Structures are given as C-alpha cells and as structure tokens.
C-alpha cells in the first residue's frame, strides 16, 4: 500500500514542479501576430488574428516614429474575453503617459494621439474560451487621416475623399471585389484594394484618393500585386482610385461629353429625317436630295485616272438610227451597176443610170447606157402599172451583133443591123451610125405597154418597126412616145455575169 500511496504523491509532486514552468512559458512566449513596421507607419495584431488568441500568452512591442513627430494609434479591432482586465488586457505606455488597460468591459477609443514618438504595446492573455485579440495600426502625426486595414468603402459616404493607409495591410484577412478599370465593390477593404490596384505598396503604405460612384451589376476578379480580387455581384455603390491631381470634374467631363455628343447626334438625325420627309424651302434642290449632310472632299482621295469609258444613251442611239433609216427610205435605192461604168448618184430602179441630159448633149461619148428624152408634163421616173399584172420591169438585154440572128421575131425583140450611112442629130434623139460590124444598137421599146402573155411584159413583134428602115427610125425618133433610144456607140456589151445579176 506504501507503493500505492506513494504513486499519487509522486504525480502531485511532478504537477507542482511543471505548473510554474508552464506558466513561465506562456508568459515569456511570443503572443504577437502579424507585425509590419516602416519609418512612418505600421500594423500589429495578436496571434492567430482574426482567430482566437492563445491562452496565457504575452505580446510586447515598442513602436516609434521619427523624432519631432507624435504617434497616432488606431485600434481596428479589439476583442478580449475578460471583463475585469485582470488577466487579459491591452496596455499602451510611454515615458510620461499610460493608456489602458483595455478589455471587453472597458470603453476603447478608436484613436489615440500621443505626445511622444515612442510607445510600448503590451498584450497579455490568461485562460479564456474565445476572443480574436486586437488589430492596431499606427502612423506619425504627418498622417492625421490614418485608417486601419479593416476600413471599407461602405464606411464612408463622401463622394470624394482621401485617406492614409499604413504599411502591412496586404495579409490582413478580408475580401475585395473588382479591378482598377471597373472599380471596386463598396464592401472591399480600401487599403487592400489600393495594394491590388498598385496605388501603394504593402511595405510602405501611402495616401489614397477615392471617388465613390454608382455600383455596377458585376465585378470581375483577378490576382494582382499578391492580392486576389474575387468576383462580386451587384452593389449600390463602388469606389475608384484617382491620382492626386485628379478631381471630380476631370472624371465627370468624359461622361458629360459623351452624353452631349450622343444627344447632339440624335438631334441631327431627327432633323435630317424630318427635312427629308417634308423638305426645306430654304435649301436648294441638291441639298434636299442628299439630306442635310454636305459632300466632304477627302484630302487623300484617289485622283481620277486618265483612262475613261464613253457610254451612249440607248434611246438617243435608237432615235438616230430611226432618223437615218427614214431619210434613206425617202430616196430611191442605188441601182445595180450595169456595164463598166460607175454609178455616181442615186436613182430609181426605173430611172436611167446615165448622166444629165445637159452633159449628153455636150459630149456624146460620155458614159451612160441610154438617153431618154423627157416630154413635158411627164414624170421623170417610171410610173407604176395601171393593171393588176405583176409589176416587173422589162429586162434590158444587149447582145453582140453576132448573136442578133439568134432571136426570133416571135420573141418580141428584134436585133437591128448596122446602118453605115444613116445619121441622127442629138436634137432628134438619134445616135451616130456604127463604125464597124462589132458595134450594135439597142432595142426599141414597144409602142403598146400591154403584154402579149402573162408573166413578164414583152413587146409584140408586130409593134416594132424595121430598124433598117430609115423612115421608120426617123418617125420613131421624132415621136418620142416613152420609148428608149438606141444606145450610144462604143459601149461594150454586157458579159454573162452582168446578165445573170440583172435576171
């Protein structure tokens, strides 16, 4: 039993020895959390912040600012479970003054302005169940607009304001939503968003200038400068960072100009549409056709090439063609060329293709086939037939003297022989006699125009006078009853090709 009684006594002895060691470890242990300090500002938290601080811990830290300046302390968060500040508290002390202790039951000021440039921060904890501890920021008296790392855009209602962020706010727990272009949701942490936007650095902190405006439906998130921005939903307000020289007028001018240009464009469009429908009596016809916009000559317009295309109006071209056709139809068509001569003027098919009578009288050797004297009161051209027979002209046939005997008297044609002694004057319509056996004379037109049979008009054999009788030849010449005179001497007979073309 001694052994049994000695066992509990040994355990009690061990507990008595270890308890002071445990208490000494908690008391001497580092109970400080996140600490970032710079020349003018810094941030300090309890251990595990914003989680529960540990039991029986001590955190002691001396902070200073340049000499000649005073310290400004701001408590962003203080959550200590103790109500009497006996074992858990926060205390600030300087060479001349002491501030605290502060705990859950005591009123804690948000800001402390000290009369010195140095202060000692002491945080102690005992046995507790919950509590976040504290978050402290500080800065020199040069930055009276100091804010903590937990300040959000929704905490301020001014449209434009400026604040000073201390060093060390990047790793403080808290979310931001948005980006530099669209702005940040008003629930975002100001100093953390400023680091995300690149306005300040986490090691030094700095001043930020903010502009509060109407919120948007969605905020895009991204990672920048070691800070992750999350996607955000619709919010009533948002804030944007501006440069120090930028004011509200500078930000509002682009929006106002855009709205003014939009309204001006809509007004001009409405006026142009109204003028196009109703018309403007004070504007020229060209302006009404093209609207109210004037033609603008561009300085870099391409010059017109030297090549060009001539276009014709189809209607004008058709009108000219019809005029030409009408004028051509008014004249007589060009007859076929007979013999070796060239036709120099237009005439009817029934008109002799010789020169004027004036020229025939002057030169009897001029080119031409026939000399037809005109009687007064008669038309120069052949008249249409008065009966219903087919209107065909009597073919004119010239043959060589050697073929004269091939035509019979029944065919309606008679080939006269040469008359070496008979002469005719130009006034009587005659021609000089043939000089050789090869020269031929033409055929006389029958006195009666009535054809013997159907088909072509053929002169009857009995209607011809004997061409060898000078008396009958003289009588025919003086009569001039629309007959053809004999051809001039010296004309070559028609060849076989010309005869085929005539027929």
Swiss-Prot record:
Among its keywords, does the record have Transmembrane helix? yes
Hey, what's the signal peptide range on this chain?
1-25
**Phosphothreonine modified-residue sites:** 406
Topology class, membrane: Single-pass type I membrane protein
- Sequence intervals crossing the membrane: 251-271
Q: Which residues carry this modification: Phosphoserine?
A: 305
Q: What is its main location?
A: membrane
Instruction: Show where the CUB domain sits.
Output: 32-141
Q: Where in the cell is it found?
A: Membrane
Pfam hit, one:
CUB
State if Transmembrane helix is listed as a keyword: yes
Region (Disordered), start-end ranges: 410-503
What residue spans carry the Polar residues bias annotation?
494-503
Q: Which residues lie on this side of the membrane: Cytoplasmic?
A: 272-503
Q: Which PANTHER family match?
A: DISCOIDIN, CUB AND LCCL DOMAIN-CONTAINING PROTEIN 1, F5/8 TYPE C DOMAIN-CONTAINING PROTEIN
Q: List the protein's name.
A: Discoidin, CUB and LCCL domain-containing protein 1
């Amino acid at each position: 039993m001694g052994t049994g009684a000695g066992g509990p006594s040994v355990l009690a002895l061990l507990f008595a020895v270890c308890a002071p060691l445990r208490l000494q470890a908690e008391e001497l242990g580092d109970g400080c959390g996140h600490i970032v300090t710079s020349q003018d500002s810094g941030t300090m938290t309890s251990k595990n912040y914003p989680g529960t601080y540990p039991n029986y811990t001590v955190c002691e830290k001396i902070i200073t600012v340049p000499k000649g300046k005073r310290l400004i302390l701001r408590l962003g968060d203080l959550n200590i479970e103790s109500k009497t500040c006996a074992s858990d508290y926060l205390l600030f002390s300087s060479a001349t003054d002491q501030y605290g202790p502060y705990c859950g039951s005591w009123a804690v000021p948000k800001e402390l302005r000290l009369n010195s440039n140095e202060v000692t921060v002491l945080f102690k904890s005992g046995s507790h169940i919950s509590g976040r501890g504290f978050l402290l920021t500080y800065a020199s008296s040069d930055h009276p607009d100091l804010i903590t790392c937990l300040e959000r855009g929704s905490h301020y209602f001014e449209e434009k304001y400026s604040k000073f962020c201390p060093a060390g706010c990047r790793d403080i727990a808290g979310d931001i939503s948005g980006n530099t272009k669209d702005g940040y949701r008003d629930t975002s942490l100001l100093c953390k968003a400023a680091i995300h936007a690149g306005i300040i650095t986490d090691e030094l902190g700095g001043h930020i200038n903010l502009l509060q405006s109407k919120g948007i439906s969605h905020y895009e998130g991204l990672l920048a400068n070691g800070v992750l921005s999350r996607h955000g939903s619709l919010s009533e307000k948002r804030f944007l960072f501006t440069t120090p020289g930028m004011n509200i007028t500078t930000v509002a001018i682009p929006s106002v100009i855009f709205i003014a240009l939009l309204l001006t464009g809509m007004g001009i469009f409405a006026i142009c549409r109204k003028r196009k429908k109703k018309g403007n009596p004070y504007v020229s016809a060209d302006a009404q056709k093209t609207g109210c916009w004037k033609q603008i000559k561009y300085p870099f317009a391409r010059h017109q090439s030297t090549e060009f295309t001539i276009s014709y109006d189809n209607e004008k071209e058709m009108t000219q063609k019809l005029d030409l056709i009408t004028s051509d139809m008014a004249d007589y068509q060009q007859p076929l060329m007979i013999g070796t001569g060239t036709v120099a003027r237009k005439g009817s098919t029934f008109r002799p293709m010789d020169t004027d009578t004036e020229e025939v009288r002057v030169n009897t050797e001029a080119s031409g086939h026939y000399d037809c004297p005109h009687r007064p009161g008669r038309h120069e051209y052949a008249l249409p037939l008065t009966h219903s027979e087919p209107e065909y002209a009597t073919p004119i046939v010239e043959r060589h003297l050697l073929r004269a005997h091939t035509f019979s008297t029944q065919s309606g044609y008679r080939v006269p022989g040469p008359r070496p002694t008979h002469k005719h004057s130009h006034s009587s319509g005659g021609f000089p006699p043939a000089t050789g056996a090869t020269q031929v004379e033409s055929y006389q037109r029958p006195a009666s125009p009535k054809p013997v049979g159907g088909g072509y008009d053929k002169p009857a054999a009995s209607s011809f006078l004997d061409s060898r009788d000078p008396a009958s030849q003289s009588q025919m010449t003086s009569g001039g009853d629309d007959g053809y005179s004999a051809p001039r001497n010296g004309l070559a007979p028609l060849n076989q090709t010309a005869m085929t073309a005539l027929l």
